[in-house]
């Protein structure tokens, strides 16, 4: 496919790039170590042969990523499904979701789209802050990721946002791909999910016509992701205390790596994805001459409401809400056994936090908030 050169530094690798990228990956010692860890019984030559047989990115995903994610879910989840009954699986969409897990939010979506009869997976927006290792950057671009550049000057950021938006419009219109992007930069560590207007502003920099036209051209779909348990909850709580105790605290070079590993392999309980109807009709209902900031405010609020309404809540969400509010207002939603099980889970997660000045009460409150906030937002949206 003839892809404009301006996208070369951010786009996923194309089929014609793959042979060279595979050769590069197979020469990398760290990549080989990862393969040996994931496939201890399989000879390296056999994996290399299977990799080189992949002619497209989708071939790679079906040969490697699909089975890997299903294997993870089999071991670390009690069930996983997607409600996408409001969508047409012959069309392509931009899924914009709440963000819980660095790797799995988009990886599970890819698997669920295939399982629900979509003809392809998603191109994935990923921040370059996660891609400091060149082989990781190669691998995610094979896996259909496009790159969001971070830590730029204001002028560079404007140029980068415009290129990113142009690329997203190109991927939807010319490549007929789906896209996944988080509703905000980074995960909502407290699970209080809110769409950042800056994401909508970026998306409307590309395309043609009015702001409403440009957003419509991306066929936006609000997507709710609900994990019964977040394996990274204790890491997120630890980070809250580190930031509270030291205003200058910054993540270390391995922190994201630990979060990725914990998120992938940790226990998730039940996992549910729910796609709201595409926003095209909603966008058509807006006054076309509305001030642009009003458009962004309205669309962001509407997306939030759709995401909140479509959460799958679990007993733990209601237990957390009642514990935080010192109430029994939601006890109809859980049993005494559910409550005891959830409280035991929280104690186990708190025990994993290693801090010299560990503030147990604060850390517990932070973890409870992560489970209570989806319930608060769901109840407010009904």
Give the predicted meaning of each segment:
Residues 257-323:
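C-terminal structural cap/anchor segments
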Residues 295, 307-382:
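Long, low-complexity C-terminal extensions of enzymes
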């Amino acid at each position: 496919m003839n892809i404009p050169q301006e996208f070369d530094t951010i786009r996923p690798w194309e089929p014609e790039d793959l042979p060279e990228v595979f050769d590069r990956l197979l020469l990398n010692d760290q990549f080989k170590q990862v393969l040996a860890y994931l496939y201890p019984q399989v000879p390296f030559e056999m994996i290399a042969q299977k990799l080189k047989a992949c002619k497209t990115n989708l071939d790679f995903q079906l040969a490697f990523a699909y089975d890997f994610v299903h294997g993870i879910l089999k071991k670390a989840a009690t069930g996983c499904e997607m409600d996408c009954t409001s969508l047409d699986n012959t069309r392509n969409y931009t899924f914009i979701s709440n963000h819980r897990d660095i790797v799995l939010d988009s990886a599970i979506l890819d698997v669920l789209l295939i399982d629900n009869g979509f003809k392809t997976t998603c191109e994935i927006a990923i921040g370059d802050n996660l891609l400091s290792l060149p082989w990781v950057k190669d691998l995610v671009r094979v896996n259909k990721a496009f790159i969001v550049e971070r830590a730029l000057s204001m002028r560079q950021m404007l140029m980068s946002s415009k290129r990113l938006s142009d690329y997203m419009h190109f991927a939807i219109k010319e490549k007929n791909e789906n896209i996944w992007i988080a509703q905000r930069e980074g995960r909502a560590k407290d699970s209080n999910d809110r769409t950042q207007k800056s994401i909508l502003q970026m998306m409307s920099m590309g395309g043609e016509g009015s702001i409403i036209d440009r957003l419509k051209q991306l066929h936006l779909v609000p997507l709710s992701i609900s994990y019964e348990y977040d394996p990274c909850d204790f890491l997120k709580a630890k980070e809250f205390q580190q930031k509270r105790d030291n205003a200058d605290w910054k993540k270390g070079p391995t922190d994201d790596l630990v979060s990725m590993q914990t998120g992938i392999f940790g226990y998730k309980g039940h996992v549910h994805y729910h796609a709201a109807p595409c926003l095209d009709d909603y966008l058509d209902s807006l006054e076309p001459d509305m001030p642009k900031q009003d458009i962004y405010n309205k669309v962001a609020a509407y997306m939030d409401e759709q995401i909140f309404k479509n959460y799958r809540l679990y007993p733990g969400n209601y237990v957390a809400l009642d514990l935080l509010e010192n109430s029994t207002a939601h006890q109809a939603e859980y049993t005494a056994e559910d409550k005891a099980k959830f409280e035991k889970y929280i104690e186990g997660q708190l025990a994993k936090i290693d801090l010299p000045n560990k503030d147990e009460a604060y850390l517990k409150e932070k973890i409870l908030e992560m489970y209570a906030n989806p319930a608060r937002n769901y109840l407010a949206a009904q």
